[in-house]
UniProtKB/Swiss-Prot annotation:
Gene: rpsQ
Assembly information from the UniProt record: Part of the 30S ribosomal subunit.
Official protein name in the record: Small ribosomal subunit protein uS17
Signal peptide: none
Function: One of the primary rRNA binding proteins, it binds specifically to the 5'-end of 16S ribosomal RNA.
């Protein structure tokens, strides 16, 4: 699989307690087919952070990668915005 075709997501870091791993919450907005109401779906991904740079509240871009552990299939590409 080429890097160009890998999925990317933008989310915020909700946990950085693990070594070289962060939990990123990604929010999707979907329209309910019957109610026509916008609903927020939040999914959490474990992402690889090689240098332990991410902190809670940072806005990051993650990219799909090969399985790195039992639950880790994403890696942090860039920190888009630092938490205040």
């Amino acid at each position: 699989m080429e890097r160009n075709y890998r999925k990317t997501r933008v989310g915020s870091v909700v946990s950085d307690k693990m070594d070289k791993t962060v939990v990123v919450a990604v929010e999707d907005r979907v329209r309910h087919p019957l109610l026509n109401k916008i609903i927020r779906h939040t999914r959490k991904f474990k992402a690889h952070d090689e240098k332990n740079e991410c902190r809670i509240g940072d806005k990051v871009r993650i990219m799909e990668t090969r399985p790195l552990s039992k639950e880790k299939r994403w890696r942090v590409v860039e920190i888009m915005e630092r938490a205040r």
